[in-house]
């Protein structure tokens, strides 16, 4: 380790320095925000939880997928979709006390933590598994194209998510904010249950590829 560190001393030095700068900025922002008499934590700050949960939970999922309890691909997709829906259920439940048309409201930060946890669990069932099956199931000459289509579908999904989010005021004014998030909970849960029902048929179409 010492020889490797000395060989890449300059790069390691600047890498370590960059981490010190980043964490210095983070600590300064936290001190400036929380040091006030009234503190507000922006929801965007919680996005770091996704990376944290991935780092902590990815080894666990890797162990499960390598064990005898490894489910089939369609079942993994179904579980991932249901976990995604459960994450939105936490947000829907947490927003029950927010009246329709409210401009501001305060809720427990734990609802966002739970939501990010279950969304990350769902992501770990979907994203790496999907990429793996693209490489396994696509014809060899089309693997690059299929990976491109997979990433393109993610880009389209992000665009549609932005468009859908723009309707939050119109929908929440009619059925409340909890009703708006309940839609995003029920749709993926329903899709996950459909994946369970189609598991046998999809496995036959995979011709024994696991």
Question: Model-found features: residue ranges?
Answer:
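Intracellular juxtamembrane helix-capping segments at the cytosolic ends
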Residues: 116, 124-139
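C-terminal ends and interior cores of transmembrane alpha-helices
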Residues: 23-32, 82-104
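Hydrophobic core of transmembrane alpha-helices in multi-pass small-molecule transporters
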Residues: 100-125
